[in-house]
C-alpha cells in the first residue's frame, strides 16, 4: 500500500492516525476504523488510535489460526503503544447455518471466549458482498437485507454494552 510506504520512514509512525483523530474525536460518540486483515503499519496505527477493537472472525476453517496472531498483536500494542486498548468483543461473520463448519466455528469460539463473543452473528449475505462494489454501505444499499439488520443489531448491542 502506498500509504504504508510513505509512513515507513516517519518518526512516530505508529501514532499518525491517533494524532490525526485528536482534533475531531470529541465530535463523535464512535469512530469506526475498518482495517484490512493484514497486521501491517495501517492496522498498527488503528490499534494505537483506538479505544477498543471489534475482532471479526469468519466462520471458516482457518479463522481461529488468525485470531491467535491478532490477539498477540493486540497484547503487544497494549504493552508498547496503547495500554488502554480494550477488546470490545469477537464478532462471528460469514455464518451459514446450513454448514456444519460454520456451526463448529461458532461453538469453538463461544466455548473458548464465552462472554467476549457478541450475541449478534453476521450471516453470509449476497447483499453484503454487493454493497462495496457500488460504493455503498449495506445500510444505504439495502437497509432491509439480512446483512443490514445483522449490523444494526450489532450496533445496538455495542451501544447497550457501553451505556451500562
What spans do the regions from the language model cover?
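P-loop/Walker-type NTP enzyme "switch/lid" segment
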Residues: 1-26, 81, 131-134
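Acidic, proline/glycine-rich intrinsically disordered inter-domain spacer in sigma factors
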Residues: 5-8, 100, 139-143
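Short, structured helix-loop boundary elements
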Residues: 14, 64-67, 148
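Generic alpha-helical secondary structure signal
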Residues: 16, 41-42, 69, 133, ...
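Conserved catalytic-core segment of NTP-binding enzymes
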Residues: 22-126
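Nucleotide phosphate-binding site architecture
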Residues: 123, 129, 139
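C-terminal boundary of histidine-terminating zinc-finger modules
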Residues: 132-150
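C-terminal alpha-helix
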Residues: 154-164
Amino acid at each position: 500500500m502506498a500509504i504504508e510506504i510513505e509512513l515507513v520512514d516517519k518518526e512516530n509512525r505508529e501514532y499518525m492516525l491517533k494524532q490525526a483523530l485528536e482534533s475531531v474525536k470529541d465530535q463523535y460518540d464512535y469512530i469506526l476504523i475498518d482495517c484490512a486483515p493484514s497486521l501491517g503499519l495501517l492496522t498498527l496505527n488503528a490499534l494505537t488510535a483506538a479505544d477498543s477493537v471489534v475482532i471479526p472472525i469468519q466462520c471458516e476453517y482457518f479463522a481461529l489460526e488468525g485470531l491467535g496472531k491478532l490477539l498477540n498483536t493486540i497484547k503487544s500494542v497494549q504493552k508498547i503503544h496503547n495500554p488502554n486498548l480494550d477488546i470490545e468483543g469477537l464478532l462471528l461473520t460469514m455464518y451459514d447455518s446450513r454448514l456444519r463448519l460454520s456451526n463448529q466455528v461458532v461453538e469453538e469460539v463461544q466455548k473458548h471466549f464465552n462472554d467476549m463473543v457478541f450475541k449478534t452473528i453476521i450471516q453470509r449475505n449476497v447483499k453484503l458482498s454487493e454493497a462495496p462494489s457500488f460504493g455503498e454501505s449495506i445500510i444505504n444499499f439495502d437497509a432491509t437485507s439480512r446483512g443490514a439488520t445483522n449490523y444494526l443489531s450489532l450496533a445496538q448491542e455495542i451501544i447497550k454494552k457501553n451505556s451500562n
